[in-house]
Amino acid sequence: MLKFIQNNREITALLAVVLLFVLPGFLDRQYLSVQTLTMVYSSAQILILLAMGATLVMLTRNIDVSVGSITGMCAVLLGMLLNAGYSLPVACVATLLLGLLAGFFNGVLVAWLKIPAIVATLGTLGLYRGIMLLWTGGKWIEGLPAELKQLSAPLLFGVSAIGWLTIILVAFMAWLLAKTAFGRSFYVTGDNLQGARQLGVRTEAIRIVAFSLNGCMAALAGIVFASQIGFIPNQTGTGLEMKAIAACVLGGISLLGGSGAIIGAVLGAWFLTQIDSVLVLLRIPAWWNDFIAGMVLLAVLVFDGRLRCALERNLRRQKYARFMMPPPPVKPASSGKKREAA
C-alpha cells in the first residue's frame, strides 16, 4: 500500500482536488457547477504553465527560483511591444524568445559553469527583476490593446483560446515524458547523473533544455497574466516561483529528481488555486491564502518524508529478513534414549 501511494502520487493529488471540490458543495450547492470548474481553471492557467516548466527542471535534480522574475520581465516586454505598435503575434513570439533565452542562460550557469542551481537562479532572480524595473522605471504598463484580452475570452465550453493551448501543452508534455526516449532522459539525468552519462545521455544538454523550456513556459505565463488583467503592475510575477515549486511537490515531483509525472504537477497547481476559491466561498480574508497553502505544503512534505522512511525500513526488512530469522528450535532428547545412556 505504501509503495502504491509513493508511485502514484498523482492519484492522491486527484483525490485531494475532488474532495476540495465536493466538500464546499455541502455549504453551497451552486459551487458544484461547470462554471466553478472553468473559473478555477482560468485562474490556474498561470500556475499550471509554471508548474510544467518547473517539473522539467526538478526532474533533472535542479531547481529554478527565477521563473517569477522571468514571467514579470516577459510580460513587461509584451506590453512595451504592443504599446509601441507591434502586432500581437510579433510581440508574443518576441516574448517567448526572451523567456527561452533567460532560461537558456540559467541552464548555462548550472550545466556548463557548474554553479549550484539554487545559487545561480537566486542571482538571475534579481537580475531579471532589475531589468524589468529598468525597462518600466518602476511604473505600471497600461493601455494594452483589446485584442490581447481576447486571448483569455471564453471560446469553447467556457474555455479561452489560451486555455485550450494550455491543455494541448499538458497533453503533449505528458506524452513526451512518458513515451519518448528524449523525455525519459530527464528522469535518467535526475536519478543517476553518472549512470546517465555512461548510457550516452548528454546530461548537460538535457539540463540546459530543461531550464530553457522552463523559461519559455514562464514567458507564456506572462502572456496569460497580461491577457487576463489587461495591464502589467511593476511587481508582476513576485512569489510565483515558490507556488510553482509547491505545486510540483504537492503533485509528487521529487525534490531529489528522477521521479514524478506532469499530471501530478498540474493537479498540484489546480489544488493550490482551488484553495483560493474555497476561501472566497468561506468568506475568509485573502491574506490567509498563503498561510493555508504553506500549511498544506508542509503537511505534504512531512507526509512524503514519513512515507519515504517507512518504505526504506520495509525494503531493509525484506532485504535482511533471512539473516534475522530465529534459529529452529532444538528438539529435546526422548526419554528412551536417556535410559539407554544411563
Swiss-Prot record:
It is found in: Cell inner membrane. Keywords: Cell inner membrane, Cell membrane, Membrane, Transmembrane, Transmembrane helix, Transport. Its main location: membrane. Residues 35-38, 91-92, 136-154, 234-251, 305-342 are cytoplasmic. GO terms for molecular function: transmembrane transporter activity. Residues 1-13, 60-69, 114, 176-212, 273-283 are periplasmic. The chain crosses the membrane at residues 14-34, 39-59, 70-90, 93-113, 115-135, 155-175, 213-233, 252-272, 284-304. It is a multi-pass membrane protein. One of its GO terms (cellular component) is plasma membrane. InterPro entries: ABC_transp_permease. Belongs to the binding-protein-dependent transport system permease family. AraH/RbsC subfamily. The complex is composed of two ATP-binding proteins (LsrA), two transmembrane proteins (LsrC and LsrD) and a solute-binding protein (LsrB). This is Autoinducer 2 import system permease protein LsrC. The gene is lsrC.
